[in-house]
A protein has these predicted regions:
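Domain-length accessory/inserted modules outside core catalytic folds
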Residues: 1-100
Length: 100
């Protein structure tokens, strides 16, 4: 089963994507072990847990937190990852102020 995410690679704009709802697919997307940062009741940013110690390049700021390496936003329902609860357009307008 796949989930819909909002994905941002370093130096690239945000884009909509789908990934398999598996740990392996999530790790491949961020390039290592995953760590989550809750940004809403039903959404998290997923990043590389070792990004800072590995010296990954700066990516962007989301909700006042700076992220390094490739990241994605997914929805959550309880302990499960689900489709991201916002569209790319809404994300850019209201959450990150124009896609930075």
């Amino acid at each position: 089963m796949e989930i819909r995410i909002l994905y941002k690679a370093v130096g690239r704009p945000w884009q909509e994507a789908s990934i398999a709802n598996t740990l392996g697919a999530m790790q491949a997307t961020v390039g290592g072990y995953i760590e989550t940062a809750r940004i809403a009741k039903n959404a998290v940013v997923v990043c590389n847990e070792e990004g800072l110690i590995r010296g990954l390049p700066y990516n962007c700021r989301v909700m006042g937190t700076d992220f390094v390496g490739d990241i994605f936003v997914a929805g959550t329902k309880g302990d499960e990852f689900v489709d991201v609860p916002v569209s790319l357009g809404d994300w850019q307008r209201y959450w990150i102020g124009g896609g930075q």
